[in-house]
Amino acid sequence: MSYNILIVDDSKTIRFVIKKTLDIADVPVGDLYEVENGKEVLDVMNSNWIDLIFADINMPVMTGIEMIKKMSEDNTLDKTPVIIVSTEGSKTRIDDLLELGVRAYLRKPINPEELRNIVKEVMGDYNEC
């Protein structure tokens, strides 16, 4: 089984690093989409099936937190898990994100083994639904 993945980060370099890390971690990727902010996520999701989202917190137009809140209101978070990938990450901030419905948090720089384990855990949870 492969996953349609959406990477959300305003840095083209970070999006590239996440793509390469997915490859190094042997995550089975189907279609791969990239956008620069949370608003674009909503647009992509309206016309494509997305299995998993990797998102930054600090982005222009619509931040990762605003995106999560909007997805929660629309009940899309129930169907599409979000993994936050950020350098930001106090315990309080991470707990707040998890309460909003984020499934996991990865700190930059990303460790391929940690990414693989989190994807397996998160997607295993969703595949059982």
Spans of model-derived segments:
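Helix N-cap/capping motif at the beta->alpha junctions
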Residues: 34-43, 64
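Receiver (REC) domain active-site loop signature in two-component systems and cognate sites
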Residues: 59
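C-terminal output helix
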Residues: 110-119
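Alpha4 helix (beta4-alpha4-beta5 surface) of REC/receiver domains from two-component response regulators
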Residues: 66, 89-104, 117
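Short amphipathic alpha-helix used as the core "switch/output" element in two-component signaling
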Residues: 43, 65-78
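Active-site beta3 strand of CheY-like receiver
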Residues: 48-54
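Two-component/phosphorelay signaling modules centered on CheY-like receiver
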Residues: 12-33, 100
